[in-house]
Amino acid sequence: MRAYGKRGPVLRTPFRSNKGLPSSSDVEFSDDDVNSVIPDVSSTISSSIADHPIEGLLDEPRKAQDSSSSFDGANEKPSSQLDSKRNDQNVKIITSSDTSMAFMKDEKLSAFNFLDGSKASKRKRRRTYQKHDANITSSIEPDVQDEDSITMHNEFESIRKIYNDINEFILKLPRADDDILNKMLENEMKMDDSIENNSIRTSKDKKYGKFRTILINKNKENEIMGEEVDQKANTLSLNNADNSNAEKEGLTSTNHYNELKNMGDTIKYQDDIEFLLSNSKSNDNTTVPINEYFKKLLNLSLMIINDEEFFQYAKRYFKKEIIKLSFAQFRSDFPELILLQGYLLHKVSESQSDFPPSFDNFSIELSKDDGKIRTKKNKHIKKLSHLNFEDFLRKTQFKTGLYYSLSLWEMHGNLSLDIIKRISILASNKDLFSRHVKTFIPLLEKLITASEFCHMYIEQPEMFDSLISNLNNQFKDMLDDDSLIKILILLTNMEVHNYTLWKEADMIFQSSMNTILESIHPLTDAKVDNILLHLGLCLNICSRENSRLKLDGKLWYDMKTIFVKMIRDGSDTENRLVQGLFYLNFSFLIKQRKENSNLDPGELNLLLVELEAFKSETSQFNEGISNKIEIALNYLKSIYTSERITI
């Protein structure tokens, strides 16, 4: 057992003489000393016990207890190891008289002879320290008690002063009426309700964008999910009213958590899009090489194609950045790059305001890509990028730059004269028009009435003839396309005479009228708009001055059959406009056939009655139709009068 300084263990002896002995605190042991002392003491004790019977030592047990307690000195406990040894032996050694102590005095002191001369003087550590502490404590305790009493007295006086001030303030307050208290309570209740409603409303209106992040503990997340499950289980056992309230509370409590989950699903794309949009310039602020720029746009395009959620996120939050990156560089001799730029602009732009300033020149260059220029291998594209570009073409179904340019022009509001000229050239090309007819038709519908468009075709009639020929070639295959029928109606309304347009008039009228006869009686709601457009186109053709339509007998017979059915079945008020336009077309065909109409006076009279009613209805909103009805009525009245005279 080791001993370290004054705090180390000290060997205690149970013997005590009446004379002053060195205190236990004055004795220190090293490791070797302790090991040598313990056997000597134990041998001495055993020899003394053998000479003197143990009964003699136990005559006065109470005195022995008092002496052992006084031996402890200044609150010292005996050594635990010696006590444990004595307990194991079940032997208690107690001094009972001065004779026994005198007998063992020499024996005890002889055990400490080896300590003589080890040091000239010993430092009194523990005893002196304890006495010093006791003296200091005895001298300081009265002062501390005085200071504590003064502090407590001051605090008590300050508290009493505050208490008196509050009592004085309360006593000075006027007595309040019950009405005032009731109003105050009502206002507080209303305020609580408004705060609760506002908190519910704001919790539902919380918005999360790309710049807001909220941390949530995993344990809290599990608690929320557990609460949701418990909430659903509890609502099943309640009545209908309680169920509705519980559902509202559940929706309110989980609204914030669900918004966090949705925000996490979208923020996961932020690093990807920021990486793709970064490094558009090199470290020295110069433009990156064209092949690296092409690779960056290609990777961004493939990401948009492969991941729809990524595309929606990029379009919502990074639309301007994508357009800016797409037009950071432009090379007219790099058609593959122009195609990628057109694709990205077509995907993310929503209106004309999203287009770059150089849109006119760019779109014209983009329209030159008809798919043939990509047969040559570009020197700017590396092998891996070339393979990725072929993958891009396959996934976009090999759409050309012409397709993207036509789509962008349709979105554009006011087209420049250069773009209109470019559209006219493209539309007059038979091969290009047939391949992109679905894209050309909506664009031509918007341009056909433009003054620049009309003047250009007047100056270049051969281009106008090519356009009309392309429209006629596609007409039979696009009878259900409302935009194509509108274009032909607008062209037939023009006063400019064009031989190419009217030489196909018989074919157009025949195809349109057959479509009308198939659906007009009975007429479904889905077909109303298309049938009205076909009736208007046929009316423009058959009502034209000096019109000489060559129709077969079957078409005339079918028209007469439908006319008779409609007359006998009565007027359908819901489709009055459709019936009136059909009667008007039928009247102009009677005028062209003249003696071959084969109508009896009764049917002719009914036709006159229907046209008169139709004229009164249309005169208020369409002057052109009203004038044509007047022409048809004059002719039919002359026929009806002559037939009555003949009869």
UniProtKB/Swiss-Prot annotation:
GO terms under cellular component: nucleus
Keywords recorded for this protein, A-Z: Nucleus
Annotated Pfam families: Wap1
Cell compartments where the protein resides: Nucleus
Organism of provenance: Saccharomyces cerevisiae (strain ATCC 204508 / S288c) (Baker's yeast)
Gene: RAD61
Extra remark: Present with 721 molecules/cell in log phase SD medium.
UniProt key word Metal-binding: no
Feature: compositional bias, Polar residues: 66-82
Protein name per UniProt: Protein RAD61
Region (Disordered): 1-90
Origin: domain of life: Eukaryota
Biological role stated in the UniProt entry: Involved in resistance to ionizing radiation.
A single BP term in Gene Ontology: negative regulation of maintenance of mitotic sister chromatid cohesion
